[in-house]
Amino acid sequence: MRLEIRNLKLEIGIMLFALLFFVPVIVCAEALDTDGDGLSDEDEQMYYTDINNPDTDGDGYPDGLEVKNGYSPHKGPGVQMHQNDYDGDGLGDWLEIWFKSDIGKIDTDGDGHNDFDEVMRGFSPSEKDGEKKFRRWIEVDRSRQRLYYFVNKIKLLNLAVSTGNPWTETPKGDFEITKMIPEKSYVGADYNLKGVKWNMLFNTGGYYIHGTYWHNDFGIRTHSHGCVNLSTQDAGLLYKYMDIGVPIRIYGD
């Protein structure tokens, strides 16, 4: 019995020795940063910065510090990431990172549509499957006379509008786009407006978001009989990326 116990202790001792001296040690190596700018070489590739130059744009700040604080490492000083569009596709660099697209490629997934167009329509710019990935909606703030367009909780458009006058208010509530008409006329007791472009119906009472050529009060004051007036240019931009069924929320005094 004593011999068995002695042999057991010897076996345990050998096992502990093996664990202490022969188990490989896992070392967590730091990411390679060739130029020592605080941005790893892998991240330098993602941001299209120079792995051998700690200050790619030569503005006196290292690339890592600029990226960490939300500034562009390509254009300085003082230009923030969302203000720069490295590949010129219409989607700012910050948004490219947010939507997981390539800041150096106009068409990240190579499907023939640029990244900005895909995001504005609610598609992923990095996947070719053609399925809509992101929720979209419109908000109209009557108090501020602004229209906001959101994709995946990110405000992509902030447009000045003129909503209905106090005696012909734009209705508050939750609606959706139900019809889209490139050009139409509006006729009433005291108006006859022909050739109005980019009309998006959102209420069965005949309320539209549409372009406007007869005034320039957008963002300044109310002006309409209940419709949401945009400049013709802004209405065209919104119309281009709009679809029937997109929700609209209207609020504010």
Features from the language model and the residues they span:
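Short, basic, low-complexity termini and linkers enriched in Ser/Thr/Gly/Pro
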Residues: M1-V23
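Extracellular calcium-associated, cysteine-rich motifs in secreted modular proteins
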Residues: C28-K133
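Solvent-exposed, acidic/flexible segments
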Residues: L32, G36, P54, G58, ...
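Cell wall/extracellular polymer interaction/catalysis modules
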Residues: T108-G110, F116-D174
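Exported/periplasmic cell-wall-interacting domains
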Residues: G130-K133, W137, T168-D174, E183-D253
